[in-house]
Structure formats: structure tokens, C-alpha cells
Design a protein with these regions (language model features):
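Interfacial "cap-and-anchor" motif at the non-cytosolic start of specific transmembrane alpha-helices
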Residues: 4-15, 21, 25, 29
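N-terminal membrane-entry
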Residues: 189-207
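Polar/charged, Q/E/K-enriched amphipathic alpha-helical segments with strong coiled-coil propensity
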Residues: 101-169, 187
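Juxtamembrane interface at the cytosolic side of transmembrane helices
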Residues: 1-13, 202-224
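Juxtamembrane amphipathic/hinge helix adjacent to a transmembrane helix
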Residues: 165-190
Length: 224
């Protein structure tokens, strides 16, 4: 039979499971949004190659989406890579460093599970590789080597841009999987704990109602 102390412990465990589930759910939502932004940025990169008349617009759109993922103050496409390297080094020395923003920063500030930080860090590092590929594409275009730029952009051969994009999305997918698995586990554990608590909580509620009704009776007897 459960004591009040054990019921309190069970309720505290249930509250902790709710907190873990909320953290995992928030991460799944944020990282799924990050994946959509990354694919959209990749589409802007392709449009940049296919539509010479609107290249400036697509370049700015790519930068804006890159900033949503890993943001830094005052950067341009020309300075993004160096600033990413600088701020990432600062983060590695101090995880509380606040020189970067964006979806990846939010995930790094919401680390809960074993392996989650390492997986997120690998995602940021893969993002950096993909960003450097983008700069190579634009440099080739600037030199008039558009065919070579297109080949580098769309090829899945090792070392080419799409291969790096695939590795980037795989790394991001692993972080999503970690959080999704823990979310499911927390929900199942929480449901099990709640199932155990519910009969006892109902019993305590009935007892409280009974005491509320019966408690005033002795004093009222004086007025009969």
C-alpha cells in the first residue's frame, strides 16, 4: 500500500517526466523547422544558379535562412564562414557563450539527453562545411565557370555539395531522432505513472470530501 510520501515521490516523478517530454517536444519542433529552413536555403542556392537576373535576391534569401539556423551579428556571405569559425571556437571554449543565435543555438541551450550535445555539435560542423561549399559555388560563378558550379552543386559524389548536404541532413536527423525517442519514452512513462497514481488520487479526493462533510458534525451537535 502506498504511503503519502511514496505518492508524493510518484507525483514528483510524473512532473519531471512532463518536463522532459516538453523539452524533447520543443527540440523536435525547432529541429524539424531547422531542417525545413535548410532545404529551403538549398533551393535558394539552386535558384541562384538557374536565374542570373535574380541572383542578388536569392543570395540574400540564402543568407537570411543561414542566419535563422546559425545567426551572427552583422555578417554577409563574404564574412559568414570566418565569423562562424570564430563564434564556434568561442562556444567550444564556453558553452554559455552567446555570440551566436538561431535554431541551432536554441537546441544547444536545451540539451537534455545523453548524446544530444555531441550530435548537435556535429550538425553545426556539417552546416559549416555546407556553407563553405556555397561560397565555392558563388566563387565559380563569379569567375564565369557556371557549368562547373552547377556540377559541384548538384553532384552526390564524395566531396561535392549535395553529398555534404546529405551528411548535414543526416546529422540533423540524428538529433531529431534522439529527442523524438525520448519524447515517446517520456510520454509512455508518464502515462504509466499517471495510471498508478489515478486510483490513489481519486481515493484521496473521496476521503477529503468525506472529511469535509463529516468534520463539522461534532461542533454542530452543540446547537441541536
Amino acid at each position: 500500500m502506498k504511503t503519502v510520501e511514496s505518492l508524493t515521490d510518484d507525483f514528483a516523478e510524473y512532473q519531471e517526466l512532463i518536463g522532459r517530454a516538453r523539452d524533447a517536444f520543443d527540440s523536435v519542433v525547432a529541429l524539424s523547422r531547422a531542417r525545413a529552413i535548410a532545404y529551403d536555403a538549398n533551393a535558394d542556392e539552386s535558384r541562384y544558379l538557374l536565374d542570373p537576373q535574380r541572383r542578388q535576391r536569392y543570395a540574400q534569401a540564402f543568407l537570411a535562412k543561414s542566419q535563422q539556423l546559425y545567426g551572427m551579428q552583422g555578417v554577409t556571405l563574404a564574412t559568414y564562414d570566418d565569423e562562424l569559425a570564430r563564434t564556434w571556437q568561442a562556444y567550444e571554449q564556453d558553452h554559455g557563450d552567446l555570440r551566436s543565435t538561431g535554431e541551432f543555438r536554441r537546441e544547444l541551450d536545451n540539451i537534455t539527453y545523453t548524446g544530444e550535445r555531441a550530435a548537435t555539435e556535429r550538425t553545426v560542423e556539417a552546416h559549416a562545411v555546407y556553407q563553405r561549399d556555397d561560397r565555392k559555388i558563388r566563387a565559380l560563378v563569379a569567375k564565369g565557370h557556371e557549368r562547373e558550379a552547377v556540377e559541384f552543386c548538384i553532384s552526390w559524389d564524395p566531396g561535392m555539395s549535395n553529398a555534404h548536404l546529405g551528411a548535414y541532413m543526416d546529422a540533423l536527423g540524428r538529433v531529431i531522432t534522439i529527442n523524438r525517442d525520448h519524447f515517446g519514452a517520456s510520454v509512455r512513462s508518464g502515462r504509466s505513472t499517471l495510471t498508478e497514481l489515478l486510483p490513489w488520487c481519486c481515493g484521496l479526493l473521496v476521503a477529503a470530501c468525506a472529511l469535509t462533510v463529516l468534520g463539522p458534525r461534532p461542533p454542530l451537535a452543540e446547537f441541536r
